[in-house]
From Swiss-Prot:
Disulfide bonds: none
Main location class: cytoplasm
Annotated stretches, region: Disordered: 168-212
Protein name, as recorded: Translation initiation factor IF-3
Organism, scientific name: Deinococcus radiodurans (strain ATCC 13939 / DSM 20539 / JCM 16871 / CCUG 27074 / LMG 4051 / NBRC 15346 / NCIMB 9279 / VKM B-1422 / R1)
GO cellular component: cytosol
Basic and acidic residues biased stretches: 176-186
GO biological process, alphabetically ordered: ribosome disassembly
Subcellular location: Cytoplasm
Any one GO molecular-function label of the UniProt entry: ribosome binding
Subunit and interaction comment: Monomer.
Length: 212
């Protein structure tokens, strides 16, 4: 994709006599008079945009500048949104943390995970606490278990200086399960078994006439 600065010259703002012209499909048209290039742009209902003013002669391109700027702005917006969603947040815990503080901090982690961010959970050790890394691991396990419904650890905890770190990543949304195809009530599926034939009706009993 071509990158065009917002302050580049367009159409009548271009004052040079000749330009090297690129067509709307990226084809090289060559060096032509600027007036002719502008006429070509008008005939195609496009704009003449100077994309490389430092070249000799300057390079111009035929394009719909308004549409191009809109697409550029949308791309920039999407890139900013993607960058924000990929940002790694950070929440710090102490080894000696009370239940209320733990609940508050895991609530922050949960919110970040729900927003699509990864979160670096850090356990900060003080003094002799560093000689008991199992205390930090215990808190990280508790964090992971508390947030198991929205995230999961990426790899194992790692020590860096006086801190123990663990990355929590948001869980991917679960794909919907496919339900079994509904069948009409009473439909037992395809069967080749024929229904049994009805039994023949019994002949009616007759009483014998008494002999004379």
């Amino acid at each position: 994709m071509i990158t065009i600065a917002k302050d580049l010259k367009v159409n009548e703002q271009i004052r040079v006599r000749q330009v090297r012209l690129i067509g709307a499909e990226g084809e090289q048209i060559g060096i032509i008079d600027t007036r002719e290039a502008m006429n070509m742009a008008r005939e195609k209902s496009l704009d003449l945009v100077m994309v490389s003013p430092q070249a000799v002669p300057p390079v111009c391109r035929l394009l719909d500048y308004g549409r191009f700027r809109y697409e550029q702005q949308q791309n920039e917006k999407e890139n900013r949104k993607r960058a924000r969603s990929q940002e790694v947040k950070a929440i710090k815990f102490r080894v000696k943390i009370d239940d209320n503080d733990f609940k508050t901090k895991t609530g922050h982690v949960r919110r970040f995970l729900n927003e699509g961010h990864k979160v670096k959970v850090t356990i900060m050790f003080r003094g002799r606490e560093r000689t008991h890394p199992e205390l930090g691991e215990r808190i990280l396990v508790r964090v992971a278990e508390t947030l198991a419904d929205v995230g999961a650890p990426e790899g194992n905890p790692s020590m860096m200086g006086m801190d123990m770190n663990m990355i929590m990543a948001p869980k991917a949304p679960a794909s919907p399960k496919k339900d079994k195809a509904d069948r009409p009530e009473g439909d037992a599926g395809d069967t080749d078994m024929a229904a049994p034939a009805p039994a023949p009706a019994a002949a009616p009993e007759t009483e014998s006439a008494p002999s004379a």
